[in-house]
Amino acid sequence: MKESDKLQILKPTASAIFDIARELGMIKEIYNELSECSKLFQDIDIKKYFFDKSISKKDKKELIDKRLKPILSKETYAFVSILTEHDSIDVLPDIVALYKEIADDYSNIVRVRIITASTIDDKTVEDIIQTVKCFSSNEISYETIVDENIIGGIIVYIGSVVYDYSIKKQIDLLQSKFTYGN
């Protein structure tokens, strides 16, 4: 399944969960629970267990009941149970990411991710954030990431928009021109 098709299917699910959380006044709590569950199900041993066809759905459900039901809200527990019953727990990270986007939109928050090859000073980060503020009246939440693989330059994610001014991107473009003649 293509990523765009997958997101088109999962977005209504994330929206429905968000709507329930909003109605209950539990937006942050349900996000935190879903996020923790998502991390839990990324564990290799847990993943193997839940995708093992020789283990019955009943046994998987009992494990969820025993371990997660006591620590999750009934809404999050019900959702995780449904995903487990339908062997769809692997989509939880995607749903959590979509939920976060919906929650950010609802709360008027713009997420900015700044990726550089080496650590940048606070003044540079502040200049980038001030530039973003010129285009958005929303609250800005940002993170900086060092990724030596980009070689140099900068990549800035503003919401779902990517501005890639990395050396790696320039090299990839040159390689593409030489390879395909575009």
Curated annotation (Swiss-Prot):
Topology class, membrane: Peripheral membrane protein
Domain of life: Bacteria
Pfam families cross-referenced by the UniProt entry: OSCP
Complexes and interactors: F-type ATPases have 2 components, F(1) - the catalytic core - and F(0) - the membrane proton channel. F(1) has five subunits: alpha(3), beta(3), gamma(1), delta(1), epsilon(1). F(0) has three main subunits: a(1), b(2) and c(10-14). The alpha and beta chains form an alternating ring which encloses part of the gamma chain. F(1) is attached to F(0) by a central stalk formed by the gamma and epsilon chains, while a peripheral stalk is formed by the delta and b chains.
Functional description taken from the UniProt entry: F(1)F(0) ATP synthase produces ATP from ADP in the presence of a proton or sodium gradient. F-type ATPases consist of two structural domains, F(1) containing the extramembraneous catalytic core and F(0) containing the membrane proton channel, linked together by a central stalk and a peripheral stalk. During catalysis, ATP synthesis in the catalytic domain of F(1) is coupled via a rotary mechanism of the central stalk subunits to proton translocation. This protein is part of the stalk that links CF(0) to CF(1). It either transmits conformational changes from CF(0) to CF(1) or is implicated in proton conduction.
Cellular compartment(s): Cell inner membrane
GO cellular component, one term: plasma membrane
GO MF: proton-transporting ATP synthase activity, rotational mechanism
Family that this chain belongs to: Belongs to the ATPase delta chain family.
HAMAP family assigned to the protein according to its UniProt record, in alphabetical order: ATP_synth_delta_bact
Protein name: ATP synthase subunit delta 1
UniProt keyword annotations, A-Z: ATP synthesis, Cell inner membrane, Cell membrane, CF(1), Hydrogen ion transport, Ion transport, Membrane, Transport
